[in-house]
UniProtKB/Swiss-Prot annotation:
InterPro entries: Integrase-like_N, TACO1_YebC-like_2nd/3rd_dom, TACO1_YebC_N, Transcrip_reg_TACO1-like, Transcrip_reg_TACO1-like_dom3, YebC-like. It is found in: Cytoplasm. PANTHER family: TRANSCRIPTIONAL REGULATORY PROTEIN YEBC-RELATED, TRANSLATIONAL ACTIVATOR OF CYTOCHROME C OXIDASE 1. This is Probable transcriptional regulatory protein BDU_30. Belongs to the TACO1 family. GO terms for biological process: regulation of DNA-templated transcription. Keywords: Cytoplasm, DNA-binding, Transcription, Transcription regulation. HAMAP family: Transcrip_reg_TACO1. Its main location: cytoplasm. It comes from the Bacteria. One of its GO terms (cellular component) is cytosol. Pfam families: TACO1_YebC_N, Transcrip_reg.
Amino acid sequence: MSGHSKWSTIKRKKGTLDAKRNKIFTKLIREISIAARMGGGDIDSNPRLRLAVNKARVANMPKDNIEKAIKKGIGDNMGSEYFELTYEAYALYGVALIIKCLTDNKNRTASEVRSVLSKSGGSLGAPGSVSYMFHKKGLISYNLDKYHEDEIIELALEAGAEDIYSEGSQVEVITSADNFESVSSILRTKFEEDIAEVALVPESKVALDKEQMDKVLAIIEKLEDCDDVQEVYHNLEIVDDIC
């Protein structure tokens, strides 16, 4: 997705789902189980679980798998204790990365992330070296094949949305992190979203030529392939039709 949207990585990420479905499902199941363990198995009262389940639905995970993951989280058979880790790093050409991980072995995860970066020309940064370049925002995306754009925009603005982007068959509602739950709840009374999540959005993006962009994307994808890596946020400007 190119153009004015701040969420230009969504189509690229969704396009990789089929090729990496099993690994993606494993990560989503882990996130669902941990969210259920931390906040309970009711998605209406557990925002983190609701976000995790929404991601699983977007990835076309079977309902049975989602329910099993929730039951695992609230049961006594969770297995290993998992830790949330965040790494700040740089890829090539000054592109900043924030790498979110869930792991049962901190040393293994640190070694794997460091190895991917060092072999690709990137490097780990100190805490705070990158995070100031990003801020949390809520994203709620709707398919215009299902709903009328004007109705979504009207209700989103009434609910307190910060911004609204329209591109192709999608409308993307942007909220502050604090207002995400309230805005999404109001919109959910009339519309069913395709995507609803809180993400780290860069203050500005780094524009590169196609060869450079492809090299950075390769690093990001290698990190995403790591078993313990849940999300990789970056400030690379992705342009599909770059010359």
